[in-house]
Regions:
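Conserved luminal/periplasmic juxtamembrane motif of membrane-embedded glycan-processing enzymes
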Residues: 1-480, 486-493, 500
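Active-site-proximal, structured, solvent-exposed surfaces of multi-pass membrane proteins
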Residues: 90, 361, 393, 447-571
Length: 571
């Protein structure tokens, strides 16, 4: 068995994509150690942006490009580092030397466990074991989420330590020893960070793409100007591209240096406050206020790199982003049920199309794996048969003359449901996906052999047979069929067993995984009403528990009021 495949869960490579690098954990203390993000506001000035301006890019756009390429860690892409704050981390460090007992070690252990989870594929022995054997763990795809555990535990421990320092009954010797150990540990950590600063190469896997783009741009410009491609010109272009890579790496190093300096200053200030508090030279209230101000300044200034005035838009500007194009208006004239593919954008990473139409694209971090497989193996390769089975009636393309989106009708779309003439059985999912390359999906359904038992009667061709969508209410979908013989229907809806149930004339029927990602149903001869209902057991159970809990709360409240009334009457 491939070590990257799992049953009932995500692929390992996919699930552990957002693993935090071990050295990257230092972003808890220095936010810019690995550059920050792929689209934040890290740079005010940038060598890379300066070079972009030299070749004609506007200043704002050049700086935007520089910010988009600042991150060079393992997680590609990312919207920013997980930063706890230098002040908070110093207080946590003090707590580790000052506090005693089970609370310290339990919070520390829980926090470190979260960090180990966040390391993901970098600690395979632990995390691959948990992925394979911890119930439901393989359903999640971002190990970096594990950092929420230390984010809670370390802060609690820091607050407990400050409270104990200011209001606890502690000997001067204990406080002095803890402060000294904290200061030594702080200097040691700064030394490690300094070593990393000088040892890092600040390279990213995307740097090669930057160089290639710049080399290509220079060669294209030279060709347009009539220059012949020569070895000398190629060498000049290589040096030109290399200059951009060197510039962005210099920017990354500068960001690390700036944030490291910032962290050292904050650590020093927090150490001074701790020293004053430990020597009783400041009262508790000023100590708490100073630490609060320092910590707030620390966190807010970093936070504004990623959430600032530029992150908000006027309501009118927001609405304009979803304004209908002429292509959208043309499609909206069709009142039928169909889907749309927008090729003018990255259809897997946009939402505007879905705002107006039933889109075959869109984005959600929690992806259905079978549909993701279909995107990567079929839709991404423009398999028209697969687009047809997804009921893609309209395709939005770019008009080469004016660059505007234009809608093209796809007359081959199969519609929301259809009967097939036969079934092609395959051994497994791999063969099922491969069969989509060459099978006439309008006439033949592709089904894995393990689902054959769910099809009581094989379909018999009937030219008069019909099946149609009556109503789609999202969670309830109704169809009607009429056939003189047994049929097999393919529904242009994604196969998802965790909640979807099928009924034929009110009797539950088995849904068959068909064409890798769709639903199939064996339909007996005659006239029938077919219904799909989304009825997840977890929702029904939660709804029932919510009702029971609400009733119990009301009983307790009214019971308490009744007892109080009864007691007052007796008095």
């Amino acid at each position: 068995k491939d070590k990257n495949t799992t049953s009932g869960g995500l692929d390992k490579d996919y699930a552990f994509k957002y693993s935090v690098g071990i050295a990257e954990t230092f972003t808890l203390l220095v936010p810019g150690i690995y550059g920050g993000s792929n689209g934040g506001n890290e740079y005010k000035t940038s060598e890379f942006a300066d070079k972009m301006q030299q070749v004609g890019y506007p200043e704002d756009q050049a700086l935007q490009y520089a910010n988009g390429m600042s991150y060079w860690g393992q997680q590609q892409p990312t919207s920013g580092p997980v930063y706890f704050g230098a002040v908070i981390m110093l207080l946590f460090l003090f707590a580790m030397f000052f506090e005693r007992g089970w609370l310290k070690w339990s919070l520390f252990a829980a926090g470190m466990f979260g960090i180990i989870l966040a390391w993901g594929k970098n600690v395979e022995a632990v995390n691959y074991f948990l992925f394979d054997y911890l119930p439901l763990y393989k359903k999640f795809r971002a190990p970096s989420m594990g950092l929420v555990m230390p984010q809670l535990c370390f802060v609690i421990l820091a607050v407990v330590a400050v409270n104990n320092l200011l209001f606890g009954d502690n000997s001067a010797e204990r406080i002095k020893k803890a402060f000294k150990q904290t200061a030594i540990a702080t200097v040691a950590i700064i030394a490690v960070l300094g070593f990393l600063y000088f040892s890092f190469d600040y390279t990213s896997p995307n740097d090669g793409r930057i160089k290639e783009n710049m080399v290509g741009a220079m060669l294209q410009q030279a060709t347009q100007q009539g220059q012949q491609p020569t070895a000398e010109l190629q060498q000049q272009a290589e040096q030109f591209g290399k200059g951009f890579v060197t510039a962005i790496q210099t920017d990354r190093k500068g960001l690390f240096a700036g944030d490291l300096t910032r962290t050292v200053i904050l650590l020093a200030l927090a150490l001074v406050v701790l020293w004053l508090a430990s020597r009783k030279k400041l009262q508790p209230l000023p100590v708490m206020l100073i630490l609060l101000v320092l910590s707030s300044f620390d966190l807010l200034t970093v936070g504004k790199r990623y959430l600032n005035d530029g992150s908000f838009v006027d309501p009118s500007d927001f609405d304009n982003a979803f304004a209908m194009t002429d292509a959208d208006k043309m499609i909206k004239q069709d009142k039928g049920y169909y889907r749309v593919l927008n090729t003018t954008v990255d259809f897997t990473n946009e939402s505007v199309t879905a705002y107006h139409h039933n889109s075959i694209g869109g984005y959600h971090p929690a992806k259905l794996q079978i549909y993701q497989d279909l995107i990567e193996n079929q839709i991404g390769r423009n398999n028209i048969q697969v687009l047809n089975m997804l009921n893609t009636k309209y395709i939005i393309v770019q008009n080469p003359q004016n660059g505007q989106p234009v809608a093209q009708m796809n007359p081959g779309a199969f519609g929301p449901v259809w009967f097939v003439k036969g079934i092609k059985y395959v051994a497994d999912g791999k063969e099922e996906m491969k069969a989509l390359d060459s099978t006439n999906l309008r006439d033949t359904a592709v089904v894995q052999t393990k689902f054959k038992s769910l099809i009581a009667n094989q379909p018999v061709a009937d030219s008069t047979a019909s099946i149609q969508l009556i109503e789609n209410k999202n969670d309830i979908i109704n169809y009607e069929s009429n056939a003189a013989s047994n049929q097999f229907a393919v529904f242009s809806e994604v196969y998802y067993t965790a909640g979807w149930n099928a009924f034929i004339d009110g009797k539950k029927a088995e849904i068959v995984k068909t064409n890798y990602a769709l639903r199939g149903l064996a339909v007996p001869a005659g006239k029938h009403k077919i219904e799909f209902r989304f009825e997840p057991k977890s929702y029904k159970l939660g709804d029932t528990l919510n009702l029971v809990s609400s009733i119990l709360v009301y009983l307790i409240v009214f019971g308490g009021l009744f007892m109080a009334w009864k007691t007052s009457k007796q008095a």
